[in-house]
C-alpha cells in the first residue's frame, strides 16, 4: 500500500512532464495519421498552397484550442465588455498584456510541437517547396541539377519527372533535409526561449523558492476544494428548490456570496508583499469586498500551474 501511494505521489508530482510527454506522443501520432491517410501531394502548381495548409492549419487550430481550453483566458475576458476595468484596472493597465502573454506562451506549446514533428518528418515541407515559383529558391534547390528541374520540380514528390531516378531522389532528400534542419532549429529556438522566459520570471520573483512552492500547492488545493464546494452547494441549492417546488412552500434562506463577492473573487490575482494573499479568493476572504491597495510593489508572479483557474 505504501509503495502504491509512493508511485501515485511520484506521478502526481510529475504530472506536468507526463502531460507534455502525452501531448508530444499525441502530436506525433496525429502527424503520422495526417501524412498517411489525408495528405496527398497534388504534384502540380498547387503544391505550395497545399503543403503550407497542411503544415500551418493544424498548428493554427491547436493554438485556438489552447486559448479556448485555458481557464485563465475566460477569467480574463469574461465581462470585460461590460466593465473594461476588469482587464485594465486603475494603476495596472499593463497587467492585461502580461497575463495575455502568459496565456499565449502556454497555448503555443502544442502548435510548436506540431510544427516540429511535421518539419522533422519532411513530407509537408517537401510538397510545399517543390511547388515554389521563386527564382531564388529554384536556383538554390536546382543548383547543379539538369535544366528540367526548373520546370518539373513540382513533380518530384510523385517521382514523375523526366529526370533520372537518382536525380529525383537527390532532390527529395535535399528538400527533406532542409525540412529537418528547420525542425531542429525550431526545437532549439523554442527550448532556449522557454528557458529564457522561465529564468526571467524566476529572477523577477519577489518571493522565495520555498514560498513559491507553497503557493503552487495552495493554489492546487484551493482549486480542487473549490470544485468540490461548487458541487456540494449546487446539490444543496437544487435539492432545496426542487423540494420547495413540489411541496409548494416558501424556501428557507440559503447563504450565498453576493454579486459583488463573485465579481471580486473572479479577478485575476496579483501578489502583494505586504499582505501575502495566495489567491484572489484568499484576498477577498481576508479583506471582505475591499480591493487590495494598488501599491507600486505589486508583483505579477503568476505561475502557470499555480493559477490555471
Curated annotation (Swiss-Prot):
InterPro entries noted in UniProt:
CALHM
> Where is a 1,2-diacyl-sn-glycero-3-phosphate bound in this sequence?
15, 32, 37, 102, 121, 202
GO MF terms held by the record: monoatomic cation channel activity
Q: On the Cytoplasmic side, which residues? A: 1-15, 71-99, 201-309
Disulfide bonding pattern of the chain:
41-127, 43-158, 142-149
Sections of the chain in a coiled coil = none
**Cellular component terms (Gene Ontology):** plasma membrane
Q: Does the keyword Metal-binding apply?
A: no
Keywords, A to Z? Answer: Disulfide bond, Ion channel, Ion transport, Membrane, Transmembrane, Transmembrane helix, Transport
- Ranges annotated as spanning the membrane: 16-37, 46-70, 100-129, 175-200
Main localization of the protein described in the UniProt heading: membrane
Q: Which residues lie on this side of the membrane: Extracellular?
A: 38-45, 130-174
Q: Where is the signal peptide?
A: none
Q: Name one GO biological process term.
A: ATP export
The source's superkingdom equals: Eukaryota
Binding partners and assembly: Oligomerizes to form undecameric cone-shaped channels.
The family annotation for this protein states: Belongs to the CALHM family.
What is the protein name stated in its UniProt record?
Answer: Calcium homeostasis modulator protein 5
Q: What high-level taxonomic lineage is stated for the organism? A: Eukaryota, Metazoa, Chordata, Craniata, Vertebrata
- Gene encoding this chain? CALHM5
Amino acid at each position: 500500500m505504501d509503495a502504491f501511494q509512493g508511485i501515485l505521489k511520484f506521478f502526481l508530482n510529475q504530472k506536468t512532464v507526463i502531460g507534455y510527454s502525452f501531448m508530444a506522443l499525441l502530436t506525433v501520432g496525429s502527424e503520422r495519421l495526417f501524412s498517411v491517410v489525408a495528405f496527398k501531394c497534388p504534384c502540380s502548381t498547387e503544391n505550395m498552397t497545399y503543403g503550407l495548409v497542411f503544415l500551418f492549419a493544424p498548428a493554427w487550430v491547436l493554438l485556438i484550442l489552447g486559448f479556448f481550453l485555458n481557464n485563465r483566458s475566460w477569467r480574463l475576458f469574461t465581462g470585460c465588455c461590460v466593465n473594461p476595468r476588469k482587464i485594465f484596472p486603475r494603476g495596472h493597465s499593463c497587467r492585461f498584456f502580461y497575463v495575455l502573454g502568459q496565456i499565449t506562451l502556454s497555448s503555443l506549446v502544442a502548435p510548436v510541437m506540431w510544427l516540429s514533428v511535421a518539419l522533422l518528418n519532411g513530407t509537408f515541407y517537401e510538397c510545399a517547396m517543390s511547388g515554389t515559383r521563386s527564382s531564388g529558391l529554384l536556383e538554390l534547390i536546382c543548383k547543379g541539377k539538369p535544366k528540367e528541374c526548373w520546370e518539373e520540380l513540382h513533380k518530384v514528390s510523385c517521382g514523375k519527372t523526366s529526370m533520372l531516378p537518382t536525380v529525383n531522389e537527390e532532390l527529395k532528400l535535399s528538400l527533406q533535409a532542409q525540412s529537418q534542419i528547420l525542425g531542429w532549429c525550431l526545437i532549439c529556438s523554442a527550448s532556449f526561449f522557454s528557458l529564457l522566459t522561465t529564468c526571467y520570471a524566476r529572477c523577477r520573483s519577489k518571493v522565495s523558492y520555498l514560498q513559491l512552492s507553497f503557493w503552487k500547492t495552495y493554489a492546487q488545493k484551493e482549486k480542487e476544494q473549490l470544485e468540490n464546494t461548487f458541487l456540494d452547494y449546487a446539490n444543496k441549492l437544487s435539492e432545496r428548490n426542487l423540494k420547495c417546488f413540489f411541496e409548494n412552500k416558501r424556501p428557507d434562506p440559503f447563504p450565498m456570496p453576493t454579486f459583488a463577492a463573485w465579481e471580486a473573487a473572479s479577478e485575476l490575482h496579483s501578489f502583494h508583499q505586504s499582505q501575502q494573499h495566495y489567491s484572489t479568493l484568499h484576498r477577498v476572504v481576508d479583506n471582505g469586498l475591499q480591493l487590495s491597495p494598488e501599491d507600486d510593489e505589486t508583483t505579477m508572479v503568476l505561475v502557470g500551474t499555480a493559477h490555471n483557474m
